[in-house]
């Protein structure tokens, strides 16, 4: 056979299978386009900061992984549907070598359309994506539509490698099976499946374990360490329940003769048993992808929309100055510098918060705070301990509290009361004179990444003694230990004026302190100065969430489409059989529709259940980013679920029409 004949056959096959190949090529084009655009952002000369480029580089790595998985997965639908066609070619005299040449030409055509189409769209839509990213980051980007040659070459090489691997996989599938097996390759799953009780039970246990971990997670650090394990349990449990659990439930319904031998239940249950065997993995994939979309979009939207709340939590005052290894002369000098700059800019300091403190880290065991300077505890009882002299507390709160030796006032950011009369710092005992319900030092918030316990002591002497006893055991160098053993001076305040004015004042204070107090380790952080870095981080995360969320959504849509097409071809014979045994068209349509509805909406329902179960642990993870506005996260999650459910329903209705065209 000549090369022209192979080419004609390949083109004819692509035309005849356009219902399955066009969506596949569109998915490939989309993957190439998204990869090229993000690659340009990560590597191009485009005015983006190093931090943003780092996030884009990480995102590009994720796109590489998901592109391989999704293209191989969608290809499996294509090759399954074409096995019968290839088997006919084989029986009619085409050797497997000839079939391989034909498939190779098809792969070349598909690859070039996908890669060049994707790169072209990447160049066209790249400018729009840069503008969107610039808007999210709150800075102007000088956009030039240029072809990034290194990115183009990398994109071409990467996706060409994927298509070569897919071709080799398809050729292997054809090579290892006989012509008869090829003819019946798309009819797999017609035998009634056996009940795999062990897999169903293991799936239920794994899912329950994942849910339990999500519900019992303590503080955010605890959530960080356990979240991955919970995700693995839920993913494996989902596959187990879809593959074995669904069939087990249906078989139980089948054994219930009173329920099963009703006309509307008989056909539905029988049909569902067969459907679940061939659809279980695909439905589990839809469920997991849907869960990923819902969580990714809702969390990144929440972080971006709630950015002002996050900044307020991270920086309670507009400007915060800390001096380590402080002394009275340095404190006076720093305070004078701050006052001069504020007066110079015609503004005024408000809500001032000035005090000295010593800081420790430990964990609470009963009424004993066990301190260790070289460990950062991540269990539910971990806490940061801040020791403050009584004089500073009285000045800050405008009170006149008194304390005897060995007495303390206690304030915790946790809403739960300490409720004991004594507290030990290692082996040093203190009597709790009063536990404070509120304080200007901080606010009650259970979602802080690390709970803070404030202890107000009679004066600086017991504080310095505790610091010395604790940090003498530290393995850190002498200079670091000396800094930790000393008191820290903290001065924070708000200002009147515009954001630009506040930013200038903060920058001037930072510059003046570095120039005029160089001998002291001094840090200055400002709400307005750090706002740009917040926009970069959360804007980039929001862009990544929406970008990857869109990709996962498109893959979900594609899987639903292929499922509907596969269901249509599989149900074509069933449709005729049900009519031949006496059911009219309306009854047949109603029976099949009920099965299809159950099949395709089960993943959405399970995804929503997964999100609800993960809600608590996700709020703990968001607290790591200082996002403690739970109401906002609830609103973002509900809005995301509603939008996704609407899109899911629209996709189902559109693909359902194609299903009925095939069946009829």
Positions of PLM-derived features:
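Alpha-helical transmembrane segments and their immediate juxtamembrane interface regions
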Residues: 228, 232-252, 309-335, 624-663
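Hydrophobic alpha-helical transmembrane segments of multi-pass inner-membrane transport and secretion
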Residues: 19-45, 51-87, 107-121, 201, ...
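Hydrophobic alpha-helical segments
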Residues: 109-253
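Short cytosolic juxtamembrane segments of multi-pass membrane proteins
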Residues: 3-5, 176-190, 569, 660-664
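N-terminal Sec/SRP start-transfer signal
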Residues: 1-32, 192-197, 206, 242-290, ...
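Short helix-loop junctions at transmembrane helix boundaries
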Residues: 40-50, 119-152, 208-226, 603-664
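Basic-flanked hydrophobic alpha-helices used for secretion and membrane insertion
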Residues: 310-324, 329-554
């Amino acid at each position: 056979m000549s090369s022209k004949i192979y080419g004609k056959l390949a083109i004819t096959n692509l035309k005849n299978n356009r219902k399955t190949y066009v969506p596949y090529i569109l998915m490939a084009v989309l993957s190439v386009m998204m990869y090229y655009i993000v690659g340009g952002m990560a590597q191009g000369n485009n005015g983006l900061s190093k931090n943003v480029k780092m996030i884009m580089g990480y995102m590009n790595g994720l796109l590489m992984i998901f592109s391989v998985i999704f293209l191989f997965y969608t290809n499996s639908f294509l090759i399954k549907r074409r096995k019968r066609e290839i088997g006919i070619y084989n029986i009619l005299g085409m050797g497997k070598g000839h079939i391989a040449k034909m498939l190779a030409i098809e792969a070349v055509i598909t690859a070039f359309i996908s890669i060049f189409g994707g790169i072209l769209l990447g160049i066209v839509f790249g400018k729009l994506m840069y503008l969107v990213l610039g808007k999210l980051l709150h800075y102007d980007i000088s956009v030039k539509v240029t072809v990034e040659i290194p990115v183009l070459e990398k994109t071409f090489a990467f996706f060409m490698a994927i298509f070569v691997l897919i071709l080799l996989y398809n050729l292997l599938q054809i090579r290892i099976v006989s012509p008869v097996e090829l003819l019946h390759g798309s009819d797999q799953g017609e035998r009634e499946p056996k009940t795999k009780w062990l897999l169903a039970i293991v799936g239920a246990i794994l899912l329950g374990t994942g849910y339990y971990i999500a519900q019992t997670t303590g503080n955010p650090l605890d959530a960080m360490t356990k979240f991955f394990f919970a995700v693995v349990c839920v993913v494996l449990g989902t596959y187990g329940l879809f593959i074995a659990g669904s069939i087990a439930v249906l078989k139980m319904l089948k054994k219930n003769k009173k329920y099963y031998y009703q006309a509307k239940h008989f056909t539905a249950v029988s049909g569902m048993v067969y459907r679940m065997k061939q659809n279980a993995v695909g439905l589990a994939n839809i469920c997991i992808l849907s869960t990923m979309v819902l969580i990714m979009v809702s969390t990144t939207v929440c972080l971006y929309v709630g950015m002002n709340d996050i900044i307020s939590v991270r920086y309670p005052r507009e400007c915060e100055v800390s001096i380590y290894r402080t002394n009275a002369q340095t404190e006076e000098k720093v305070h004078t510098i701050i006052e001069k700059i504020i007066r110079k800019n015609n503004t005024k300091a408000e809500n001032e918060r000035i005090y000295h403190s010593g800081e420790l880290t430990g964990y609470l065991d009963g009424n004993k705070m066990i301190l260790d300077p070289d460990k950062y505890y991540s269990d539910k009882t971990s806490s940061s301990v801040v020791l403050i002299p009584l004089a500073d507390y009285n000045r800050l709160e405008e009170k006149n509290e008194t304390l005897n030796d060995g007495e303390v006032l206690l304030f915790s950011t946790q809403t739960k009361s300490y409720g004991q009369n004594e507290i030990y710092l290692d082996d040093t005992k203190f009597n709790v004179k009063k536990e404070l319900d509120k304080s200007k030092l901080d606010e009650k918030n259970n979602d802080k990444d690390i709970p803070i316990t404030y202890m107000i002591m009679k004066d600086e002497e017991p504080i310095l003694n505790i610091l010395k006893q604790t940090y003498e055991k530290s393995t850190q160098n002498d200079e670091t230990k000396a800094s930790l053993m000393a008191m820290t001076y903290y001065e924070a305040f708000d200002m009147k004026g515009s954001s630009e004015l506040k930013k200038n004042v903060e920058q001037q204070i930072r510059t003046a302190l570095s120039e005029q107090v160089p001998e002291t380790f001094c840090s200055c952080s400002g709400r307005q100065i750090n706002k740009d870095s917040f926009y970069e981080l959360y804007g980039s995360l929001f862009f990544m969430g929406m970008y990857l969320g869109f990709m996962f959504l498109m893959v979900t849509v594609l899987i639903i489409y292929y499922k509907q097409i596969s269901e249509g071809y599989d149900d074509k014979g069933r449709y005729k059989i049900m009519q031949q045994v006496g059911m009219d068209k309306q009854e047949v349509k109603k029976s099949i529709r009920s099965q299809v509805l159950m099949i395709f909406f089960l993943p959405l329902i399970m995804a929503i259940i997964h999100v609800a179960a993960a809600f608590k642990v996700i709020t703990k993870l968001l607290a790591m980013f200082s996002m403690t506005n739970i109401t906002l996260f609830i609103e973002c999650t509900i809005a995301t679920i509603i939008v996704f459910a609407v899109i899911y329903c629209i996709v189902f209705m559109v693909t359902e029409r194609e299903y009925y065209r095939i069946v009829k």
